[in-house]
Each structure stands twice: as structure tokens, then as C-alpha cells.
């Protein structure tokens, strides 16, 4: 059939509305939703005809496409996905998962009124930051603390407060890009601090900082390169040395440690990552870090340090523009409470638990998943193998965590097609593909995910 005839054969919306199945959907949904979905279905087939992708279709085809479109239009765009990649802090999949206590706290303050900015003791207006400041001080040892909506905002606010219109000295090797094309030099520019780069990419000495200090210097800045490592012929100035230099010239020292861990992972066999507590113990005046990376909480930028500097930041006009909402505060409070006892934090905060759980546990879990798949899914090959998980989220670069995975292949469908179908399924499952095999890393899977994975695999060849 020629293109013109195919276009003429496209049904009209009024015609489709008379179809029994469409009428049934019309009774259950708004007319606007049904008509919009019908229009999308007709437009889809018109486009396919114009592209010469089809040479025939039926009214039933158009109606079936309408049904799929309507269901998609009804569903929320923000979906739950199953993370089978083995990347624990997966930036694109929402980073850290919240602890149960944090989730319960969010629900409580979301479905009820709360004392967000109300002092129950005095019966007067209070500060939203008071709900978490004491907790942050307790778990970090800081004199004072405040929270904004993300770590880039924390860096910008701190720099704007400490050295607006003045110079911030930083090592050239620490001018990191923190993701999404957001770069430390750009954040500094918006803070209205003037960047002074010192040293080289791989080597910076104390004299590089000292030789650039002048009457217009506002802060000495150290940025932890949490999302990359420079190996080989390298040297950087320690926090202790910078604090001594800052004291000599009466300049504040600020450190952005990015991923913001409160746990010393070297105790558990990982490469040492600077903790918030260690930076403060070394005398750093202001430390900034993220809430949704190694901390395992909600997206937030946490600022800790000397009270005189934090108090100035609280009064900065930028603070209102950067403040966090009640749900984030509730989630952060619930997360921080877990850190009063490190053992409790590791047990209850999913990010920490996933990173620190032993591979032997995951071997048994991988074997269980493989058995369920083998017992319920035909025409696929499943095997358990050793592999490596990643921390992710721009944290612990180069660190790999021994794990066990289920590897999948089939003679009837390619690994790439399996990946696509799982990703586009009703319950999206995100996997890795390597050497013509689909990889399901159980480190980032929950037991509740196993049945869903089995059900979605059963649909792959239908």
C-alpha cells in the first residue's frame, strides 16, 4: 500500500472513541488523558508511515499502542529502579539509599505539621538548622555546623563568606570537576572569590602557597580529589602544614572533602579516605562535604568548623536561597542518629552496609538468585562468578570491592537486547553488559528484588 493511502487509513479520534475498549478506558480515566493518548498513538503511526518504516497497520494496532501510551502517561515519571550494576552510590540512580529511621522521620514530618522553625520550649520562632546542628557537632566534633542544599552550594557559601572580592589560594592539582560539568573554578567564580592557582598538576609545595599570600588573600583552600587519583611523581601539602601556614598569616583554612565520610574505611581494609573528624582534629577552620555520598543520607551540603565562621555564614543572604527543606532535614537527622554508634551506622545505613558487607555473604545470595532464575526461566544460561563492585558517586576512585555476580546469556537473544528489555520493563532493572553476558551484581540488590528479576526475565522471550 502506498504512503498516501496509509495516511488516509489512519483512524480519526472520534472514530476510535467509539471503540468498546477505548470507551472502557474513557470511563476509568479523564477524557483529556484518553484523547491525548489517542492523538499520540495516531501521531506515532503517522510518523512511522512518513519514515517508510511500515507498509501496513490495523485499527487494532493503533488501539494497542494507545493502551500502552495511556498507561505510560498515567505512570509517574520518577520511577523505582532495581540497581544490579554493583555501583553502590550510583549518581544516575539517586546515589545513597536512606536508612529506615531516616525514611520514617521524613514520613512523620511530611504528613504532619512540624516544629520546622518553631521553638517549642519558648513558643517563639526558631531555626531550622537547630534540629541537626547538635547532632552534626556530636558526630564530627565540630564547634558549629550548618546545612545547605548540596556540597557545591556549601563551597560557594563558605567562599563567599570568607573571601568575597578577595583571593582564595588553591593547588592546581585540586581544581576538580565534580560532575555534570560543575567545576571548582566555576563555583569559586560564582562565590565572587578570586582564584589563585599554585603549584602544578602533580606537585604542590608549601612555599607555593606562602609565596602567593598577600594583603588581599582571604582563605587557603584545600580540595580533596575524591573522584580521581594522581599516581607517581606527586606531592601535596598536608592539612597540618596548611593550618600552620594559615595561623602564621592569620588566614582561615578551608577544606572541601567532597564525599564526606565519617567512618575510617581503612579499618575495614580499604584505602584511607580523609574523614570529617580527622580534618577538624588537624585544625582546619571550615570543612564542607556531601550528605548523599559516603554519609549515606539525603542530598545536602554540610558545613562544619569554627563557630565564628559558621555564624557569619548563617547571616549571609545566600543562606536563604540555599537552605534545605523539612524533608531533607528530617532525612539527615535520621541518618546522623545512626552515627552515634558506628556499628549501628554500618548495620542500618544501606550505603555503608553495601560497601562493607563481605563477599561471602554475596556468594550465597548470588547462588540463591541463580537457583530462582534456573528454576523459573527457560532458554537462558546462568552462572555465579566472582567480580568487582564499585563505590561510585565520585568516591574512593580506583577502589574495587570483591563480590559475586550472576552472569546471564542466551542463544535466543543478545546481551544488549536483554539489557534494553530489562531497562524498559515495567520494573526497570539496570544491569551491566560485558563480553556478551548480562551481569547482575547482588551487592546492590535486595532480597525483595529477586522475585521481580525472575518475573521480568520470564517475559524477555515473549
From Swiss-Prot:
Keywords (A to Z) from UniProt: Cytoplasm, Protein biosynthesis, Pyridoxal phosphate, Selenium, Transferase
Catalytic activity: L-seryl-tRNA(Sec) + selenophosphate + H(+) = L-selenocysteinyl-tRNA(Sec) + phosphate
Broad class of the protein's primary localization: cytoplasm
A GO molecular function held by the record: L-seryl-tRNA(Sec) selenium transferase activity
GO biological process: conversion of seryl-tRNAsec to selenocys-tRNAsec; selenocysteine incorporation
E.C. designation(s): 2.9.1.1
Short name of any one Pfam family annotated for the protein: SelA
Residues that bear N6-(pyridoxal phosphate)lysine: 293
Localization, UniProt: Cytoplasm
Pathway participation: Aminoacyl-tRNA biosynthesis; selenocysteinyl-tRNA(Sec) biosynthesis; selenocysteinyl-tRNA(Sec) from L-seryl-tRNA(Sec) (bacterial route): step 1/1
Cofactor(s) this protein cannot do without: pyridoxal 5'-phosphate
GO CC, alphabetical: cytoplasm
Top EC class for this record: transferase
Record's function text: Converts seryl-tRNA(Sec) to selenocysteinyl-tRNA(Sec) required for selenoprotein biosynthesis.
Family label: Belongs to the SelA family.
Stated name of the protein: L-seryl-tRNA(Sec) selenium transferase
Record gene name: selA
